[in-house]
Regions:
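Central beta-strand plus flanking loop segment that forms part of the substrate or channel wall
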Residues: 140-143, 148, 194-197, 322-337
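Helical element adjacent to the flavin cofactor pocket in flavoenzyme catalytic cores
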Residues: 241-303
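Extreme N-terminal leader/targeting segments of oxidoreductases
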Residues: 2-96, 114-121
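Glycine-rich Rossmann-fold phosphate-binding loop(s) that bind the pyrophosphate
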Residues: 100-106, 128
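Central helical "cap/lid" subdomain
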Residues: 296-337
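Rossmann-like flavin
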Residues: 154-266
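Redox-cofactor binding/interface segments in oxidoreductases and associated redox assembly factors
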Residues: 99, 145, 308-309
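Glycine-rich FAD pyrophosphate-binding loop
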Residues: 115-138
């Protein structure tokens, strides 16, 4: 397991948690491992953390959300908890403070409080805007394992074992999220379907076939679900003229906003988590007495542990990651026929 890559791969960075941490998944999977011999929870401390801030670069100046952001399709009908604050003021202290109320942040809070190894930790979630207002509320709503797009790159960079582990992790999300939705009876327009990857470049098609053969040779159970086609069959199956190859496999669609807001609603209804929206974190500093002081425009709060789940904006608080976690703009369209 690559200790350096795990925190960014799965969307959350853990600060101040124990060195024996093993983070398998900060998303909505039962593989999220929070266990310790003393029955608290276990995290792997990121090797890149640097305590001496004199050696750190200055944080990016533009990491806070912009004013008047573009309205996402998912936000046309805002949930009543979108701008929720569990209490009028910030709690003075918490066992755990999670920065970010998107997929990673709310899912982490859910697992800490309602997972198989639930505990009595006090948890506060701080969000710069509304719940699910960042990347989670602005994606295409696809639960689509990345079977080919980046897996070859991961294999080349980190080896076959690491690349296939990421593929297995993504595939496992489908069933994990399906079970979660069924367990909590979440109405989020969830649908299981088939997706198709298409290659119209001959060289890329050959490379895709090599990846398919490599992954198939590993006796991975999920590869039984992948159907790979070449040449004329690829055109007929995909409907794309000139297709040199295609692969189909199970995927899903859902409303990410409805999913995450329902999880947040469950946590709020059961008074398991204190959620504070429109509360951007401007700094996190060690407290000489132990733990950390989190500063916001609304005041400060103390935490024994801090979980960074603010995705692309994490370098604003942890500048040592500014060359490792780089925000990128993308375009996602809602098309009706």
């Amino acid at each position: 397991m690559d200790r350096m890559s795990r925190p960014f791969t799965y969307g959350a960075i853990i600060l101040g948690l124990l060195p024996s941490f093993r983070l398998i998944n900060t998303a909505l999977s039962n593989r999220f491992d929070v266990q310790l011999p003393d029955s608290t929870f276990q995290f792997e401390y990121p090797g890149a953390m640097v305590s001496d801030k004199h050696f750190l670069p200055d944080p990016p100046a533009n990491y806070l959300p912009v004013e008047n952001p573009t309205l996402s399709f998912w936000h046309e009908n805002l949930h009543e908890l979108h701008d929720a604050r569990s209490t009028p003021d910030l709690p003075p202290t918490s066992d755990v403070v999670i920065i970010g109320a998107g997929y990673a942040g709310i899912a982490t809070a859910y697992h800490l409080k309602k997972g198989e190894r639930r505990n009595n930790l006090s948890v506060t979630v701080l969000e710069a805007r509304g719940i699910c207002s960042g990347a989670t509320g602005r994606n295409g709503g696809h639960l689509r394992p990345d079977m080919y797009g980046h897996i070859p790159k991961y294999i080349e960079r980190a080896g076959v074992k690491a690349g296939l582990e990421i593929a297995e992790f993504e595939v496992a999300h489908l069933e994990a999220i399906k079970k979660l939705i069924e367990k909590e009876k979440i109405d989020c327009d969830f649908t299981l379907t088939r997706t198709v990857d298409v290659w119209i470049n001959k060289t890329a098609a050959i490379k895709a076939r090599e990846v398919y053969d490599l992954m198939s040779s590993r006796n991975l159970a999920y590869m039984d679900d992948v159907f790979f086609s070449r040449s004329e069959d690829a055109e007929n199956i995909s409907g794309i003229k000139g297709a040199q190859a295609c692969a189909t496999y199970t995927a899903g669609t859902l409303s990410p906003y409805k999913l995450i807001l329902r999880l947040a609603e469950i946590l709020v209804e059961e008074k398991l988590v204190n959620i504070q929206t429109n509360t951007p974190v401007t700094s996190v500093t060690p407290d000489p007495r132990g733990g950390f002081i989190i500063t916001t425009p609304r005041g400060t709060t103390h935490a024994n542990k801090v979980i960074y789940a603010n995705n692309a904006h994490v370098a604003g608080l942890l500048p040592e990651y500014q060359n490792a976690i780089v925000p990128c703009k993308g375009i996602c369209s809602h098309i009706t026929v």
